[in-house]
From Swiss-Prot:
Family: Belongs to the somatostatin family.
Signal peptide: 1-24
One Gene Ontology cellular component annotation held by this UniProt entry: neuronal dense core vesicle
Residues cleaved off as propeptide: 35-88
PANTHER family (UniProt xref): SOMATOSTATIN
Record-annotated disulphide pairs: C105-C116
Pfam families: Somatostatin
Expression sites (tissue/organ): In the pancreas, somatostatin is expressed in delta cells of the islets of Langerhans. In the stomach, it is expressed in parietal cells of oxyntic mucosa and in the small intestine, it is found in the villus (at protein level). Neuronostatin is expressed in the pancreas in delta cells of the islets of Langerhans, as well as in the stomach, in parietal cells of oxyntic mucosa and in the small intestine, in the villus (at protein level).
Organism from which the protein derives: Mus musculus (Mouse)
Post-translational modification note: C-terminal amidation of the neuronostatin peptide is required for its biological activity, including for the regulation of mean arterial pressure.
Modified residues (Threonine amide): T43
Gene Ontology molecular-function annotations: hormone activity; receptor ligand activity
Gene Ontology BP terms: hyperosmotic response; regulation of cell migration; regulation of postsynaptic membrane neurotransmitter receptor levels; response to acidic pH; response to amino acid; response to steroid hormone; response to xenobiotic stimulus; somatostatin signaling pathway
Annotated protein name in UniProt: Somatostatin
């Protein structure tokens, strides 16, 4: 009984010392500065990529438009659709995109049916 109490007391003492050592550890300002720079660089790269994509999509290809013949019209429509889709994907947030629901579709999730 005494050895069990002693083991519990030693375990509690070790936990208290470990927590005290972690909270009392000095924070490294270089690490904090590095993390801030990396976060700023990541958002800057993402904004730069969106800017270049928008610029690329907004440039008209004059040589293709001037030499457009009637049989090329369906291909031009497809290119316009692809361009619009790329613009939508660049402007929209993929994490916030709403899911399309189908009529009468049901999913089985955790013992219940939910509509898709």
């Amino acid at each position: 009984m005494l050895s069990c109490r002693l083991q519990c007391a030693l375990a509690a003492l070790c936990i208290v010392l470990a927590l005290g050592g972690v909270t009392g550890a000095p924070s490294d300002p270089r690490l904090r500065q590095f993390l801030q720079k990396s976060l700023a660089a990541a958002t800057g790269k993402q904004e730069l990529a969106k800017y270049f994509l928008a610029e690329l999509l907004s440039e008209p290809n004059q040589t293709e438009n001037d030499a457009l013949e009637p049989e090329d019209l369906p291909q031009a429509a497809e290119q316009d659709e692809m361009r619009l889709e790329l613009q939508r994907s660049a402007n929209s947030n993929p994490a916030m995109a709403p899911r399309e629901r189908k009529a009468g579709c049901k999913n089985f999730f955790w013992k219940t049916f939910t509509s898709c």
